[in-house]
Amino acid sequence: MVLNPRGFGAGTIRRATAFDDPWLRETGAEVYAAFGDFRSILPSWLHHPGVLTFVEEDKHHEPRGFILLGFYEPSDMPPVTYVADLLAIAVAPAHQNKGIGTRLLSYAVDLATTAGLRTAVSEMRLTVAHTNVGALKLFARHGFEVLDNHHGAYDGGQRAIRMRRRFRRST
């Protein structure tokens, strides 16, 4: 459990448990409704062995946001090189614009960077809708750059933009 990482407001970021599944599904479906049927996608990610799920909660243990971070070996990189993929980042609507998304993203980047120092995780990638201007700005502030400006489309019709942040490797 990590208490108050990076000094943002009172709260905790912790690993999700099976008890969080209903909240994760409902919140994900609500936050991502414009992009497609997240409710049908999320269960396969929640229980995939290569995906880590973290929940941000307030001091009363009420969840406010979550991240899903997957790790995989991409076909476009040398063998035994891994990528951390931010599969989802969501903040419940009642808690948006309060720094929670920034906090969750910082946590994910720190986690992937730490993994990269110990393993062959060379970068973090994510996909975002071209209409999600706030998220695009947030990701750019955290060092993400556009990798593919036309990475397909969401079920809602939005163009998908693939972004990445490379990690420095110590030699």
Task: Locate predicted features.
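Acyl-donor (CoA/ACP) binding surface of acyl/acetyltransferases
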Residues: 98, 102, 150-151, 157, ...
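A short beta-turn/loop motif at secondary-structure boundaries
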Residues: 44-48, 131, 153-157
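Acetyl-CoA-dependent GNAT
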Residues: 2-11, 15-96, 102-118, 166-168
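Conserved catalytic-core motifs of GNAT/GCN5-like acyltransferases
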Residues: 125-128, 140, 145-162
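Conserved short alpha-helix immediately C-terminal to the canonical SAM/SAH-binding motif I
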Residues: 104, 132-135
